[in-house]
Amino acid sequence: MYTFKIGIPAEVHDTFVKNHPLCNLLQSSSWAKVKDNWGSEIVGVYEKDTLVASSLVLIKPLPAGFTMLYTPRGPVMDYTNERLVSYFMAELKKFGKKKRALFIKMDPAVHYQDFHLGEEHQPHAEATAIVETLKKAGAKYQGLTMDMGATIQPRFQANIYREDFSEEQLSKSTKKMIKTAEKKGVVV
């Protein structure tokens, strides 16, 4: 039995997000402070006394008293649990109606593909299944658009993993900027 809750305490939400495989900075409660021109609320789903899904929801005022809701890189939950996804989405829609939202945007931190430059890449089968689960729950999938205006966050993310990184790879100007920052007290 699931229970949807509005007003999850920030520390409870942050602990849940930090310990979840889909952890993302944009789902931290602190992100709401960065987006201080939007309202915010933390919502979640409990199964008995255990938080099983949570999301920072940003609320942007629109003309005529309407809003739009946005869950940056969220909601954070087990997307392989169709019952949970369906319940969360239904409750999020009800929450949106209370907030007079015209629409809800979301872009969960589900990796569609992961690859190193030059490697062949295929979509993750689980990501494709997650898209189908979300569609069954009523989400409208925007597809793999290349139009930057169609999404709020960039679709592509380039990473340099710690195990693949060495300072020798950096350009001379980057090394100089790092040294300058360190002299000014920035920890790099």
Report the location of each language-model feature.
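A short, well-structured alpha-helix characteristic of acyl/acetyltransferase catalytic modules
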Residues: I8-F16
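Short alpha-helical segments and helix-capping/turn motifs at coil-helix boundaries
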Residues: S28-S29, Y87-L92, Y141-L144
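Residues lining hydrophobic/aromatic ligand-binding pockets adjacent to catalytic sites
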Residues: Y2, D14, V45
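Acyltransferase donor/substrate-recognition loop-hinge adjacent to the catalytic core
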Residues: M1-I8, V52, A127-V188
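Short, basic/aromatic recognition patches
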Residues: P21-W38
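Short, polar loop/linker segments at the starts of domains and inter-domain junctions
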Residues: T15-C23, Y87
